[in-house]
Amino acid sequence: HGDFGGNTQQKDSSFTTNYFHLFPTIALQYGLTSEHLFQLSYGRRITRPNYGDLNPFTYIFDDYTHEGGNTKLHPSFSDNIELGYVYRDWFQTVLFFSHTDDAIMKSYREQEGRRIYVMPQNLSSYVQTGMRVHAANLSPVSFWKVNLTAIGIYNNYGWTEQGQKMKNRMFTPIFGCMNQFAFTSVWSAELSANYNGRMAYGQATVHPALEVNVGIQKKMFRNRCTVTLFAKDVFNTNYQKVDIQSPGVQAFVDERHNKRVLGIAFAWRFQKGSETKESRRKKEIDETKRVNL
């Protein structure tokens, strides 16, 4: 249940929205054998506009870009279905489908010549379907463990702009790889890479992005001390590049901030976990003796 009310500081601009809906969730699981497990789930969800989406005031970023909220936004409702298969707890594949009515996305409109006004609006439909595959704890050699994730997503957005029916649909590949290396009992390292392909996002098209992270760790003083040296976005390839096209509007965003981070972390453990567990166990035994159990 939801209830919105407010005033946009303009005469005769009061607004009220009331709604009542049910949001069921169903999850089923079937074990064919001890190694093969099938899962099926369905859920209906609501996404409400946040404060910034409803704020009627305009923010001026520069001479070419203004952004504001939209007091006429409605909540969006989505139906989500997933069918999954799990093999021996290390391999999982999932087929998913989602249909959203009144999806809340940013819209881009031309105002007064070359100025772009950005505001959220409800798109008439948004359909997402795809497949997700995950393999965990693969071990090519004794000191090397790998987690792999591959996702294929097809996004299909539909809306009406200036009387024209518009669509933005695209297939997007997503890959993730996490490598863990245990060279010795005290030396270890991690290497991860994540890639997002070209993606449809409302009226916008987001360009591919890649991020590579690396870290190395050393344990010292009988494993009480841990020193970690790490680097994020090693090749500085995780930047935002977006194309926007709609009737009367063609815009390009290319933000290339340097997101590379090099850091060092130091951790000291003052008491071993095994000693803590043993102390807790001793207290439990003493308490049992005290009450004569």
Predicted regions and their residues:
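Conserved C-terminal beta-signal and adjacent last beta-strands/turns
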Residues: M170-L293
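Outer-membrane beta-barrel strand-turn architecture
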Residues: L22, Y30-S34, F77, Y87-D89, ...
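Surface-exposed extracellular loop regions of Gram-negative outer-membrane beta-barrel proteins
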Residues: H1-F15, Y19-T25, F143-Y154, I174-R198
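Transmembrane beta-strands of outer-membrane beta-barrel proteins
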Residues: P24, F38-L40, F91-L95, M131, ...
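Residues on the lipid-exposed face of transmembrane beta-strands in outer-membrane beta-barrel proteins
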Residues: I26-Y30, I81-Y87, M131-N137, G152, ...
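Outer-membrane beta-barrel signature, preferentially recognizing the C-terminal barrel domain
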Residues: T17, I46-L95, H99, M119-T129, ...
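Outer membrane beta-barrel strand-and-loop segments of large Gram-negative receptors
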Residues: H74, N80, T93-T149, G158-G176
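Transmembrane beta-strands of outer-membrane beta-barrel pores
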Residues: H1-F4, Y42-R48, F57-T58, D89, ...
